[in-house]
Amino acid sequence: MEGSTVYFTDFRCPVGTSLTEKLRRLCLAAGIKTIDMDGRFVAIKMHFGELGNLAFLRPNYAKVVADLCREQGGLPFLTDCNTLYPGSRKNALEHLACAQENGFWPMTTGCQILIGDGLRGTDEVEVPVPNGEYCKTAKIGRAIMDADVFISLTHFKGHESTGFGGTIKNIGMGCGSRAGKMEQHASGHPAVQESLCRGCHRCAKECGSDAIVYNEQNKAVIDQDKCKGCGRCIGACNFDAIYSQCDSANEMLDRKMAEYAAAVCYDRPTFHISLVQDISPNCDCHCENDAPILPDIGMFASFDPVALDQACADACLAAAPLPNSQLGQNLAKPGWNCHHDNFKDSNPNIEWKATLEQAEKIGMGTRRYTLKKV
């Protein structure tokens, strides 16, 4: 497969030019108007942010994309699926309320919001995975699969379970119904380093599976039979006592996620946008966001989600770590085993390349790309 084209623009704004205008120009240069949207439903997949988290993409960006779709006669809607864990997005009613509190309204985004897998996260469609090795079918939110055109709008950042959260994760994990998320997460479970555990019980409060108990020494213990492997406890721990086990199970989560993403994108027009800004070390699913580990880099767009993620990852690997951050503090620790990899040095024991490898292997796209600046 030949290399794909990824379009890029930075965040510098001369007087009279806004970031929303730069995003519009990026999408036009990347070819969004070559997609036939006339009279068609267009799903715009994004993350509305957990309440308390402020790293998610602003609704203004969504409006740029929705406006472009409407200009082409499309019927756009913003969408995401419900979560496995407790929080403000575990069912459609609370999910919508969360989105609204974070600023996502029709007047601010230019379109309506539909929760992809319905009220309880059970409104799903089981679809085939093209060339799937780990998943022959994928359980995807029905509203997302009912759309004629699929567009992903992604906040690219670090992630405690997958190294980074990019386009493939936004699609693969984000579009999975509750059962679909369970299937992906079932492979990899976190573990506890007892010597670092302070017995604060915060991880147990965050666990939606009641999988964390405390032993006689008041140290956290994870019941591997109950654990869904969602990784929320990793981000909840302030003492780095809970970590993702770097083994075949964790790698399988990454590969399943790629296969789910391929199922969502298969056999219909797709377009992908990724904003590399507010690069927090962990997922936007947390009710807080830590200081960014890297400076804001820019906006990227492509028809190829694999090339897009690779381009964003390469840009992050080349960036200088910020000192007052999880990454900067890790690198400053005496005796730190430096990986020379900003994702692995921020969240050790995570191998992030498996997702891209699997996506390329099953034909979702290519990791080879040409970067064109807009």
Please give the residue ranges for each predicted region.
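Terminal amphipathic helices with adjacent charged low-complexity linkers/tails
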Residues: 66-67
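Extended, low-polarity segments enriched in aliphatic/aromatic residues
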Residues: 2-61, 71-80, 85-374
